[in-house]
């Protein structure tokens, strides 16, 4: 599909696609970081991986690996709903600037949240960025519900 077709189907769609793709890449980066931390700390989840990297004693948990896994799980709990909400919201005909702000606030909130989580930054940075990123999701969800209810 040519790029101009994306904009014609919904002026907000290109912004959504850009932010969504960046968020998916960010999730891949967290997964890669998790793997690197496992290797550095010699803390493997599977016995066969531990055997390959030194022996069965390395099939163990590690606080830093667990932190990475929690960050990744938190991404899944927030980014997957955003992908649905943002896609549907894009087709409601929102003001393109307002849509951009929804998508950008979520993206920046999630990036800072990940940096705060993995970097062990002091409270309340992580919880503030988590909440900030949830505001556009709540806004989009309410607008979707409103539009759906209007057409019942």
UniProtKB/Swiss-Prot annotation:
Residues 1-12, 91-95 are lumenal. It is found in: Membrane; Cytoplasm, Perinuclear region. It comes from the Eukaryota. The record marks 49, 126 as: Essential for protaglandin-E synthase activity. Pfam families: MAPEG. Keywords: Cytoplasm, Fatty acid biosynthesis, Fatty acid metabolism, Isomerase, Lipid biosynthesis, Lipid metabolism, Membrane, Oxidoreductase, Prostaglandin biosynthesis, Prostaglandin metabolism, Transferase, Transmembrane, Transmembrane helix. Its cofactor is glutathione. GO terms for molecular function: glutathione binding; glutathione peroxidase activity; glutathione transferase activity; prostaglandin-E synthase activity. The keyword Cytoplasm applies. It catalyses: prostaglandin H2 = prostaglandin E2; 2-glyceryl-prostaglandin H2 = 2-glyceryl-prostaglandin E2; prostaglandin G2 = (15S)-15-hydroperoxy-prostaglandin E2; 1-chloro-2,4-dinitrobenzene + glutathione = 2,4-dinitrophenyl-S-glutathione + chloride + H(+). Glutathione binds at residues 38, 73-77, 113, 117, 126-130. Pathway: Lipid metabolism; prostaglandin biosynthesis. The chain crosses the membrane at residues 13-41, 61-90, 96-119, 124-152. SUPFAM superfamilies: MAPEG domain-like. Terminal enzyme of the cyclooxygenase (COX)-2-mediated prostaglandin E2 (PGE2) biosynthetic pathway. Catalyzes the glutathione-dependent oxidoreduction of prostaglandin endoperoxide H2 (PGH2) to prostaglandin E2 (PGE2) in response to inflammatory stimuli. Plays a key role in inflammation response, fever and pain. Also catalyzes the oxidoreduction of endocannabinoids into prostaglandin glycerol esters and PGG2 into 15-hydroperoxy-PGE2. Belongs to the MAPEG family. This is Prostaglandin E synthase. It comes from Macaca fascicularis.
């Amino acid at each position: 599909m040519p790029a101009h077709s994306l904009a014609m189907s919904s002026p907000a769609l290109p912004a959504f696609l850009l932010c969504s793709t960046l968020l998916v890449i960010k999730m891949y980066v967290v997964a890669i970081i998790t793997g690197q931390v496992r290797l550095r700390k010699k803390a493997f989840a599977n016995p066969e991986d531990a055997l390959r990297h030194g022996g069965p004693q390395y099939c163990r948990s590690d606080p830093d690996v667990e932190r990475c896994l929690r960050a990744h799980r938190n991404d899944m709990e927030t980014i997957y709903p955003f992908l649905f909400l943002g896609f549907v919201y894009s087709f409601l005909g929102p003001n393109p600037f307002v849509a951009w702000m929804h998508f950008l606030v979520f993206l920046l909130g999630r990036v800072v949240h990940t940096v705060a989580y993995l970097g062990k930054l002091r409270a309340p940075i992580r919880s503030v960025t988590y909440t900030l990123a949830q505001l556009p999701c709540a806004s989009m969800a309410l607008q979707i519900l409103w539009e759906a209810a209007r057409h019942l």
